[in-house]
């Protein structure tokens, strides 16, 4: 789980860093969203990072993604809600006030390209170094 309380570097927590990394990767067309795209990217070993929703209702999806991440040792991070993950990766409409509407749940996202170097990317990498 991406703990709210852990702050690598003392500036940004892991969830905030994850949102930044996903947003940057989305802008640079470096995301594979959904189980099919994610499985393809993981199988081809194009992935740098995999994000899986903990509330995924299909246990076989979870097993597949965990297995595909385990063999080549791709970093896997779990978030608690698929709707939140869907919002973070742009699977929603934004209304006039800037609030997300019609959010589509997303159970799995793979970052194929970070886009650019950032503090958020460093925080995520530091999180996995500490975790290992």
Curated annotation (Swiss-Prot):
GO MF annotation: an example: structural constituent of ribosome
UniProt keywords, alphabetically: Cytoplasm, Ribonucleoprotein, Ribosomal protein
Domain of life where this protein originates: Eukaryota
SUPFAM superfamilies: L30e-like
Location(s), subcellular: Cytoplasm
Protein name, per record: Small ribosomal subunit protein eS12
GO cellular component assignments: cytosolic small ribosomal subunit
Family recorded in the similarity comment: Belongs to the eukaryotic ribosomal protein eS12 family.
GO biological process, alphabetically ordered: maintenance of translational fidelity; ribosomal small subunit biogenesis
Protein's gene: rps12
InterPro entries: Ribosomal_eL30-like_sf, Ribosomal_eL8/eL30/eS12/Gad45, Ribosomal_eS12, Ribosomal_eS12_CS
Lineage, top ranks: Eukaryota, Metazoa, Chordata, Craniata, Vertebrata
Pfam families: Ribosomal_L7Ae
């Amino acid at each position: 789980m991406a703990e709210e309380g852990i702050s690598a570097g003392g500036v940004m927590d892991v969830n905030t860093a994850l949102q930044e990394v996903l947003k940057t990767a989305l802008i640079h067309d470096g995301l594979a969203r959904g189980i099919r795209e994610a499985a393809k990217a993981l199988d081809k070993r194009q992935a740098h990072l995999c994000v899986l929703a903990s509330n995924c209702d299909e246990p076989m999806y979870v097993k597949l993604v965990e297995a595909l991440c385990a063999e080549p040792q791709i970093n896997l991070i779990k978030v608690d809600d698929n709707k939140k993950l869907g919002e973070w990766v742009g699977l929603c409409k934004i209304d006039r006030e800037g609030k997300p509407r019609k959010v589509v749940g997303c159970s799995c996202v793979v970052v194929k390209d970070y886009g650019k170097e950032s503090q958020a990317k460093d925080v995520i990498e530091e999180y996995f170094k500490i975790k290992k």
